[in-house]
Amino acid sequence: MKPSHKSCEAAPLLPKMPETSTHNAPLNLSFPSVPSYQIGCSSLPEISRSTERALKEGKLPELVYGVKETVATLSQIPVSIFVTGDSGNGMSSFINALRIIGHEEDASAPTGVVRTTQTRAEYSSSHFPNVVLWDLPGLGATAQTVENYIEEMKFSTCDLFIIVASEQFSSNHVKLAKIIQSMGKRFYVIWTKLDRDLSTSVLSEVRLIQNIQENIRENLQKEGVKEVPIFLVSNLDPLLHDFPELRNTLQTDLSNIRCCEPLKTLYVIYEKIIGDKVANWNQIIANGRLKSSLGVRDDDDMGECLKRYRLIFGIDDESLQQIAHGMGTVVMEYKANIKSQDFHTLRRADWKLRLMTCTTVNALFCLFKFLPCLCHCFKRMRHKRMLLLVAKDTKNILKKILMDAVSPPQI
């Protein structure tokens, strides 16, 4: 078997990619707040245009396939992970355990009681496609400062960091965490030798784990480091303790790092398309062309008009069923995100529409039929409100499609 790693002297990992300033900004799509990058993929513009066309035409089931294709393309983007910490903390052993390979295998990272990692070395894993795991030389073996270490190891080229610790959470670990946080990067703290701690401690397993976690948090909080994921593992047991949770968290964060910014951009485009569509229909309503444009016999029949609006925007029952099928889930996952399933449900959910259609207003509406201008004004208000609510539901469905494409719902 050919080794899947190679040593290098701090060569650049990837072409330097510009970071966005959205790390601390609220995310419209409610993705976890992780650093994200504007990474170019030649096929993405055409895929994006196809989804935009589908949205303009109210064909959301077609949009689903374009979004899934977008996420599949983004998933091929390489991501670099730096594994760092003090010398002797078991960083190389951790990399082998994370990849679920034995130390004796050709592709494994060299391990030993003496310092084995002298230069940066990169590794790959079938469990994390298109991910480069970088095993960095341990910090603290020389008089080198943390700042010089970070510069020499090219921290600015990394997407996600793993700070490895064992026995004690040192000042070097805290400095690393503080600097990485100031860079706006995502990172975890991994305690790697839990098996040894459990075998030597007089405390119960629950109490020992609690003590380790509290100690790490206290040291970080003293230096103003915000809440960070902490995982306690044993390098000897790659399937036990927090390893499964770590791998799941890592998979989620990898998806967010790759997809978050492009999908946020796509959602902004979708919002504009919906806004333009609402403006166009508001003009139709204002011009008194609603009946012919909607294709209804009676534009005072709010229930029938609602069905037409839902069809125009692509969130009618049949479309929702097709969307759910395309996303591999049940239709109720999507119906639960809308209020416009029928007119009575929508009316109950929105007090303004309820007021516009209450008995008193309906009686006035009948009287105003003898005053065409006032009658038209009331009708326009009702339809504009209902149109706005359908547009809002459409945005909710689009948001869910984008989120589910990255993290499919569990059914």
From Swiss-Prot:
Its EC number is 3.6.5.-. Gene3D superfamilies: P-loop containing nucleotide triphosphate hydrolases (3.40.50.300). InterPro entries: G_IRG_dom, Immunity-related_GTPase-like, IRG, P-loop_NTPase. GTP binds at residues 86-93, 111-115, 193-195, 234-236. One of its GO terms (biological process) is positive regulation of CD4-positive, alpha-beta T cell proliferation. It comes from the Eukaryota. Residues 1-21 are annotated as: Disordered. One of its GO terms (cellular component) is phagocytic vesicle membrane. Residues 352-376 are annotated as: Alpha-K amphipathic helix. The modification Phosphoserine is found at S204. CDD domains: p47_IIGP_like. Disulfide bonds: none annotated. Keywords: Autophagy, Cell membrane, Cell projection, Cytoplasmic vesicle, Endosome, Golgi apparatus, GTP-binding, Hydrolase, Immunity, Innate immunity, Isopeptide bond, Lipid-binding, Lipoprotein, Lysosome, Membrane, Mitochondrion, Nucleotide-binding, Palmitate, Phosphoprotein, Ubl conjugation. Interacts with ULK1; promoting the coassembly of ULK1 and BECN1. Interacts with BECN1; enhancing BECN1-interacting partners and influencing the composition of the BECN1 complex. Interacts with ATG16L1. Interacts with NOD2; promoting Irgm 'Lys-63'-linked polyubiquitination, which is required for interactions with the core autophagy factors. Interacts with STX17; promoting STX17 recruitment to autophagosomes. Interacts with ATG8 proteins (GABARAP, GABARAPL1, GABARAPL2, MAP1LC3A, MAP1LC3B and MAP1LC3C); promoting STX17 recruitment to autophagosomes. Belongs to the TRAFAC class dynamin-like GTPase superfamily. IRG family. Immunity-related GTPase that plays important roles in innate immunity and inflammatory response. Acts as a dynamin-like protein that binds to intracellular membranes and promotes remodeling and trafficking of those membranes. Required for clearance of acute protozoan and bacterial infections by interacting with autophagy and lysosome regulatory proteins, thereby promoting the fusion of phagosomes with lysosomes for efficient degradation of cargo including microbes. Regulates selective autophagy, including xenophagy and mitophagy, both directly and indirectly. This is Immunity-related GTPase family M protein. It comes from Rattus norvegicus (Rat). The gene is Irgm.
